[in-house]
Amino acid sequence: MTEDKAQQKPSSTAEPTEPLATLERGPVSQFLADNGFDHQYLGRDAAGVELLEVERDFLLPVCTALYAYGFNYLECQCGYDLGAGQPLVSLYHLIKLADGADRPQEVRVQVKLPRQDPRVPSVYWIWKSADWQERETYDMYGIIFEGHPNLKRILMPEDWIGWPLRKDYITPDFYELQDAY
């Protein structure tokens, strides 16, 4: 019986194990890769939506290709801050609307931008719905959308200093309230 136990013990020498599962590209990422568009596939979120990351210099070519692929609706463009000293992110949630589709295909594209130079090309000329969404992201995070036809503050007063949703934003101690009359 002791011999059986000795044989059942795991060996102390580590045998090579199989590599961890790699991310299998989704159909949108595969389309972009097949057509030579530089991007990084980040996987899928809990809802099963593909998440891609592109460099800011490649945003317009990638978005133009996605529009040609059928992503005809920009559901949401937003920004977020990864934290003090970390990049800002511009995120695009695209949908392929088609007649008779049970569930439209979706993809999210993100661009990380350095805090010191948060510039990215505007996608307004591809999807007109980006107009006010890019303005709001500019107003709250200070991301500059180059080529936007009317990039100005939309929520805060024009003379407001700073970007209120950045994590390094310092809230003023005093707000000057003006009468609405």
UniProtKB/Swiss-Prot annotation:
It is a peripheral membrane protein. NCBIfam families: NuoC_fam (TIGR01961), PRK12494.1 (NF009141). One of its GO terms (molecular function) is quinone binding. GO terms for biological process: photosynthesis, light reaction. InterPro entries: NADH_DH_suC (IPR010218), NADH_quin_OxRdtase_su_C/D-like (IPR037232), NADH_UbQ_OxRdtase_30kDa_su (IPR001268), NADH_UbQ_OxRdtase_CS (IPR020396). Keywords: Membrane, NAD, NADP, Plastoquinone, Quinone, Thylakoid, Translocase, Transport. It is found in: Cellular thylakoid membrane. Residues 1-20 are annotated as: Disordered. One of its GO terms (cellular component) is plasma membrane-derived thylakoid membrane. Its EC number is 7.1.1.-. It is an enzyme of class 7 (translocase). Its main location: membrane. Belongs to the complex I 30 kDa subunit family. NDH-1 shuttles electrons from an unknown electron donor, via FMN and iron-sulfur (Fe-S) centers, to quinones in the respiratory and/or the photosynthetic chain. The immediate electron acceptor for the enzyme in this species is believed to be plastoquinone. Couples the redox reaction to proton translocation, and thus conserves the redox energy in a proton gradient. Cyanobacterial NDH-1 also plays a role in inorganic carbon-concentration. It catalyses: a plastoquinone + NADH + (n+1) H(+)(in) = a plastoquinol + NAD(+) + n H(+)(out); a plastoquinone + NADPH + (n+1) H(+)(in) = a plastoquinol + NADP(+) + n H(+)(out). This is NAD(P)H-quinone oxidoreductase subunit J. NDH-1 can be composed of about 15 different subunits; different subcomplexes with different compositions have been identified which probably have different functions.
